[in-house]
Design a protein with these regions (language model features):
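Short beta-strand element of the alpha/beta-hydrolase
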Residues: 61-71
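A domain-start/cap signature at the N-terminus of enzymes
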Residues: 21-63, 107, 136, 251-254, ...
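C-terminal catalytic histidine-bearing segment of alpha/beta-hydrolase fold enzymes
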Residues: 190-193, 197-274, 285-302
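Short beta-strand/loop motif that positions the catalytic acidic residue
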Residues: 176-179
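Gly/Ser-rich "nucleophile elbow"/oxyanion-hole loop immediately N-terminal to the catalytic nucleophile
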Residues: 55-62, 104-135, 149
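Primarily recognizes the serine-hydrolase "nucleophile elbow" in alpha/beta-hydrolase
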Residues: 78, 118-121, 127-173
Length: 475
């Protein structure tokens, strides 16, 4: 079965010792109020991060900090999403340019580098250190928080806990989860409600209109706003009654809007979160009554049944596609009486049907399921192909995975780039050039990734390769 999962390693995060008394150095040249794409670590120039310092940053007081982990080492992306909240609430935000899905030591090294460097450069509030991540980066953030005991809260986007780590009463951090309704990990984030509650972990899970991606700016801002609230509740931030009242009214309006739009499941979760989040900060009796009323309503029960049916159909389609892939790869056909197709014909038919459903202009059950299934299959194949290519140099198997990834989603240029790499490694110049051409035609624009890759050395003198590079230089 083809699955996408975070690498299961049980290494313990080893923190580099630090003290708030460390000298704050080399910050004068870093602009405030602007995203800086690359800050090299003072102790290791191979480690870098994207950074946002609030415009009013001063070393005269300590600041909350949010460390971000992207599955593809794109440090800029999370900083872009969280910089508005950073400016509004006075947080330092940084995203590693090194951390990525793969060997756990890569994540640990990036984490240690960021942790050490920020304490050397900036005035950090060690009581208010947070971590966020997307997909495999979300699992990395959770694992770090569970291991180091220094993280006050985690914002997990597009994924939850590592497969070998479950919510526990020993965990000290609060948890904010976010997932798009079209995310193939949507069910995973939603299913965390029960284990988080049983473990006594203060939490909120928010959904948004989107796929498997970092959350949009409003959701990222809501996550930081919620963390501010929890800091006040936990005594790590001075109580601000105006902030508490305004946040209460905002969340209450959002819940009522969802309920009025008959989005009962989302409304119920928000009401439930309101009661839990504000208990101890203000009277929540009215909302607790609302939670009980809505929890027993026919409307919510119907919404839950519909959501569960979506998840079941998603899982059934995922299983069916994986079976068809295995049958096609093995040269065998399955259930040939089904619609008169064997595996080789049935697989592209199902993929075509799902792509049509995924392109629908309006949200629907069919569109959500199609997008979840296609994106989940693509990511699984893509990550598998890259692992076989880079870590194992198993070019033939990598070609098989990446080629299928391009069939699942023919609009993603990155898959064609890595497929070209695999073909080049397998000494198939013709297909390597074809795939590289397709990658550029579909939007691949990073000429440096091609010129720096030794796998393409055998192609440099080919006229088609030179045409590709000339086209990139004109862009």
């Amino acid at each position: 079965m083809i699955i996408s999962s975070f690498v299961r390693l049980s290494l313990i995060v080893t923190l580099v010792a630090h003290s708030t008394a460390l000298a704050i150095t080399q910050t004068s040249s870093i602009p405030r109020g602007h995203l800086v794409e690359r800050v090299e670590a003072l102790n290791d120039s191979s480690q870098s991060y994207a950074l946002y310092l609030p415009s009013n940053y001063t070393p005269d007081r300590k600041w909350p900090v949010l460390y971000a982990f992207d599955p593809g080492a794109r440090g800029r992306v999370p900083v872009e999403r969280f910089k508005e909240a950073a400016e509004k609430y006075g947080w330092i935000v940084l995203g590693s340019n090194n951390s990525r899905n793969g060997p756990w030591n890569v994540v640990v090294n990036a984490w240690n580098a960021m942790l050490t460097d920020t304490h050397q450069r900036f005035a950090i509030d060690d009581e208010r250190t947070y971590a966020t991540g997307f997909s495999g980066g979300a699992r990395a953030a959770v694992r770090i928080a569970a291991a180091c005991k220094c993280i006050a809260g985690v914002v997990a986007n597009g994924a939850g806990f590592p497969v070998d780590l479950a919510p526990s009463s020993q965990m000290h951090f609060v948890f904010f989860g976010a997932a798009g309704v079209d995310d193939f990990n949507y069910a995973e984030l939603k299913s965390l409600e029960e284990p988080l509650t049983k473990a006594g972990i203060i939490h909120r899970v928010q959904t948004f209109a989107g796929r498997h991606e970092w959350p949009p700016v409003p959701v990222a801002t809501a996550a930081v706003q919620w963390m501010e609230l929890q800091a006040m509740k936990g005594g790590k931030q001075p109580r601000d009654d105006n902030f508490i009242s305004a946040t209460w009214q905002q969340f209450l309006r959002e819940a009522r809007t969802l309920e009025a739009a008959t989005r009962y499941s989302e409304a119920y979760q928000l009401y439930l979160g309101l009661a839990a989040s504000f208990k101890g900060l203000r009277d929540v009796a009215e909302i607790e009554t609302k939670v009980n009323q809505l929890g027993n309503s026919r409307e919510l029960k119907a919404a839950i049944r519909d959501e569960q049916a979506q998840i079941r159909k998603q899982r059934q389609l995922e299983s069916r596609l994986n079976t068809l892939i295995a049958a096609r790869d093995g040269g065998a056909s399955i259930n040939q009486t089904e619609e008169g197709f064997d595996a080789g014909n049935l697989l592209p038919k199902i993929l075509n049907d799902l792509r049509k459903q995924s392109r629908a202009s309006e949200d629907s059950t069919d569109r959500r399921i199609a997008r979840r299934v296609l994106d989940g299959l693509f990511v699984g194949l893509f990550e598998q192909g890259i692992g076989l290519l880079q870590a194992e140099k198993n070019y033939a198997s990598s070609i098989k995975s990446l080629k299928l990834a391009t069939e699942v989603n023919p609009d993603r240029p990155g898959a064609f780039f890595y497929l070209a790499w695999a073909y080049a490694g397998n000494r198939d110049k013709k297909k390597a050039l074809q795939s590289l051409t397709t990658a550029v035609e579909k939007g691949f624009s990073d000429a440096a990734m091609i010129t720096a890759n030794n796998a393409f050395d055998s192609l440099r003198n080919e006229p088609q390769y030179q045409q590709i590079m000339a086209r990139l230089q004109k862009q």
